[in-house]
Structure formats: structure tokens, C-alpha cells
């Protein structure tokens, strides 16, 4: 079996291409989920202030036998904290029981309140101080990203966006790539695979490779060069989602999955919502 792949970010730091998402997991659930994930081989954990489970993540990491330098921990600056990124980060670090973050992401641009450029400047300062190794954003459209770059000269290393076979965001993914911004997929299985796992091409590929539909979709993300963070608290599914290193999809198969794109957004529109 091939080793899990690592992505090099434009700031020179590296991160695992596949991680564990913990959205909607309780503090108790997340402890067991991370224990299982680390046992299986995950080294990247993606949480957020808004998930209200940073304390559980911190307890799980404290109890882990994996060295801190082997882990890649991400959390996110919530909308209400865009004018106080330093305080918000310090609160997150305390809950996570960490001295630094590997990746700090701004959760939404929230253009209606228009604080995201100032928040980004604050995050740049936190990176310079060494409190965070890398900084990025979530749910930013091209015009939001361009404004960050124009006004600060510092591009995000990551843009984490809703991305799955029904919502492939090819234009944004390509723009990110042109600007050396790594695209990361949230809701990569389209919220449990509804409308995806029953697609003929997904079922046929699952049969061909002896894999589950979820594994086919995760492999599609990986083979498209995306960082992917499927969420689960179910031990068997956590293991299943990581067992994707012994096969690859070919160009034609990727092309067939590309045809599933409907522009079907399951989450909020970044221009209309604050999450």
C-alpha cells in the first residue's frame, strides 16, 4: 500500500492530503473519533471554534501517543471574532492545549460586515509571531481572495470550500491553483453521499476496485489534487475513509465523475451568508 500523500503549501509548510473533519461532533464523540483516527494513521485534524468541540480535540491530543510535530491541527476564526483574531486564537489554543496551530483559517468572509481584510492582517501578524505556522481561509470566492492579495500582498495558503461531485467549483479550484492556493474540500461526500453514492459511475467504480462509494469519492478528491477532510465519528467509517492508498482513478474515470457536476451547493452561499 502506498503511503498517505503530503501536500507542500506555498509558504513551505507541508500538510497531509487527507484528514479527519469533526464538524457536528460533540466533545465526547470527538475524543473517541480522534483516538481511532490516529490509530488508523490520520495525522491531520480539522476543527473550528464554531464546532464547539475544541476542548474535546485538546483532550484527545493530550492523551495521544503521537508526537506533536507529527500532527497537523487546524482550527478556524469565527465570524464574531474577526475584529479580535489574537484573543480568539489564544482561546482556541487554550482549549486545544497547544502552543501553536499548524493552520488557522478564517471561517467565512462575511462581506456584509466587511471585516475580513482587517482580520486577515491580524492573522498575518499571528503567523509572524509563530503562534500559527500557516494561515488560510474558508468559503472565499475569487473576488474575496483577490481583495486580500491586493490589500495585504499575502495570499492564503489554503481555501477550504464546499466541494464534492455535485459541486465541483472548477473555476475557483483553477483560480486557486494559478495563485498557488491549495484547495481543500469540505463536505467532500456531499453530506453523507446523498445523490452521489447511488450514481452509476460511482457504483461501477466501487465494483471495479472493490471499494465503497465513499472511498471512490475520497480517491477522486485526492486524484484531483485536493486536500480532503471527510467527517465521521463512526470507528468503522473513519478507518474506511483512510483505506484509499492502494488504488488510483485514471484520467477517464476522473472525467466521468466530472460529468456529475450540477453546481449543487448544499451549504450557505459565501456572498449571502456568514455560515
UniProtKB/Swiss-Prot annotation:
- Which domain of life does this protein belong to? Bacteria
GO BP of this protein? L-ascorbic acid biosynthetic process
Q: Which residues bind NADP(+)?
A: 187-241
Q: Where in the cell is it found?
A: Cytoplasm
Q: Extract one GO cellular component term from the record.
A: cytoplasm
- The answer to keyword Ubl conjugation applying to this record is no
Q: InterPro entries this protein is in?
A: AKR, Aldo/ket_reductase_CS, NADP_OxRdtase_dom, NADP_OxRdtase_dom_sf
**EC class:** oxidoreductase
Which UniProt keywords are present, listed alphabetically?
Cytoplasm, NADP, Oxidoreductase
Instruction: Return any one Pfam family short name.
Output: Aldo_ket_red
Q: What PROSITE patterns does its record include?
A: ALDOKETO_REDUCTASE_1, ALDOKETO_REDUCTASE_2, ALDOKETO_REDUCTASE_3
Principal location listed in the UniProt entry: cytoplasm
Q: What is its EC number?
A: 1.1.1.-
Q: GO MF terms on file? A: aldo-keto reductase (NADPH) activity
Q: What are the catalytic residues?
A: 51
Reaction catalysed by this enzyme: hydroxyacetone + NADP(+) = methylglyoxal + NADPH + H(+)
Give me the residues that bind substrate, please.
107
What is known about its subunit structure? Monomer.
- Describe its function: Aldo-keto reductase that significantly contributes to cellular methylglyoxal detoxification by catalyzing the NADPH-dependent conversion of methylglyoxal to acetol.
Per the record, the similarity remark reads: Belongs to the aldo/keto reductase family.
Its protein name is: Putative methylglyoxal reductase DkgA
Amino acid at each position: 500500500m502506498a503511503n498517505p500523500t503530503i501536500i507542500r503549501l506555498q509558504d513551505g509548510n507541508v500538510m497531509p492530503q487527507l484528514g479527519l473533519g469533526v464538524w457536528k461532533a460533540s466533545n465526547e464523540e470527538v475524543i473517541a473519533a480522534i483516538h481511532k483516527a490516529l490509530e488508523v494513521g490520520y495525522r491531520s485534524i480539522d476543527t473550528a471554534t464554531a464546532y464547539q468541540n475544541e476542548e474535546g480535540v485538546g483532550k484527545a491530543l493530550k492523551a495521544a501517543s503521537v508526537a506533536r510535530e507529527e500532527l497537523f491541527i487546524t482550527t478556524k476564526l469565527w465570524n464574531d471574532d474577526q475584529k479580535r483574531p489574537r484573543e480568539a486564537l489564544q482561546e482556541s489554543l487554550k482549549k486545544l492545549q497547544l502552543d501553536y496551530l499548524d493552520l488557522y483559517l478564517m471561517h467565512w468572509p462575511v462581506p456584509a460586515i466587511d471585516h475580513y481584510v482587517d482580520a486577515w492582517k491580524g492573522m498575518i501578524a499571528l503567523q509572524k509571531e509563530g503562534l500559527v505556522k500557516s494561515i488560510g481561509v474558508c468559503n472565499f470566492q475569487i473576488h474575496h481572495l483577490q481583495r486580500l492579495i491586493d490589500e495585504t500582498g499575502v495570499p492564503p495558503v489554503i481555501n477550504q470550500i464546499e466541494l464534492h461531485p455535485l459541486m465541483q467549483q472548477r473555476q475557483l479550484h483553477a483560480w486557486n491553483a494559478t495563485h498557488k492556493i491549495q484547495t481543500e474540500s469540505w463536505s467532500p461526500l456531499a453530506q453523507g453521499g446523498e445523490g452521489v453514492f447511488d450514481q452509476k459511475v460511482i457504483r461501477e467504480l466501487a465494483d471495479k476496485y472493490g471499494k465503497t462509494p465513499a472511498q471512490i469519492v475520497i480517491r477522486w478528491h485526492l486524484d484531483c489534487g485536493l486536500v480532503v477532510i471527510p467527517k465521521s465519528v463512526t470507528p468503522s467509517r473513519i478507518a474506511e475513509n483512510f483505506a484509499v492508498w492502494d488504488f488510483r482513478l485514471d484520467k477517464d474515470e476522473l472525467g466521468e465523475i466530472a460529468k456529475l457536476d450540477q453546481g449543487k451547493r448544499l451549504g450557505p452561499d459565501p456572498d449571502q451568508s456568514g455560515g
